[in-house]
């Protein structure tokens, strides 16, 4: 059950990257959150503690939901179809994805 749930999240992330508007990277995610943009932040499980604290601080101020995915940044990059690690991503528009429902499950 846990594996299937993880696969659904991975698929939703990939669809959001392919069909929606997603910002990759911690610096760009924090920058957009500070401007009140974004609907959901997804953080890799191995994201640096200080970066994670910054993201949680700014998302609390902007009331943006955060989901900590239990994959590494390298795996999150692969899920996004990128050849580099992704520690955080910010969903601006979900596209055809049901990514915004993951916090409710």
UniProtKB/Swiss-Prot annotation:
It holds the Pfam family Ribosomal_L7Ae. GO terms for molecular function: RNA binding; structural constituent of ribosome. The keyword Transcription does not apply. The gene is rpl30e. GO terms for biological process: translation. This is Large ribosomal subunit protein eL30. Disulfide bonds: none annotated. InterPro entries: Ribosomal_eL30, Ribosomal_eL30-like, Ribosomal_eL30-like_sf, Ribosomal_eL30_CS, Ribosomal_eL8/eL30/eS12/Gad45. PROSITE patterns: RIBOSOMAL_L30E_1, RIBOSOMAL_L30E_2. Belongs to the eukaryotic ribosomal protein eL30 family. GO terms for cellular component: cytosolic large ribosomal subunit. It comes from the Archaea. Keywords: Ribonucleoprotein, Ribosomal protein.
């Amino acid at each position: 059950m846990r594996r299937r749930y993880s696969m659904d999240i991975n698929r939703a992330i990939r669809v959001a990257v392919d069909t929606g508007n997603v910002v990759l990277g911690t610096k760009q995610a924090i920058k957009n959150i500070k401007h009140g943009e974004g609907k959901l932040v997804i953080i890799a499980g191995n994201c640096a503690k200080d970066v994670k604290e910054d993201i949680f601080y700014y998302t609390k101020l902007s009331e943006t939901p955060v989901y900590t995915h239990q994959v590494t940044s390298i795996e999150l990059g692969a899920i996004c179809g990128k050849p580099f690690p992704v520690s955080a991503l910010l969903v601006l528009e979900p596209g055809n994805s049901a990514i915004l429902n993951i916090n409710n499950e």
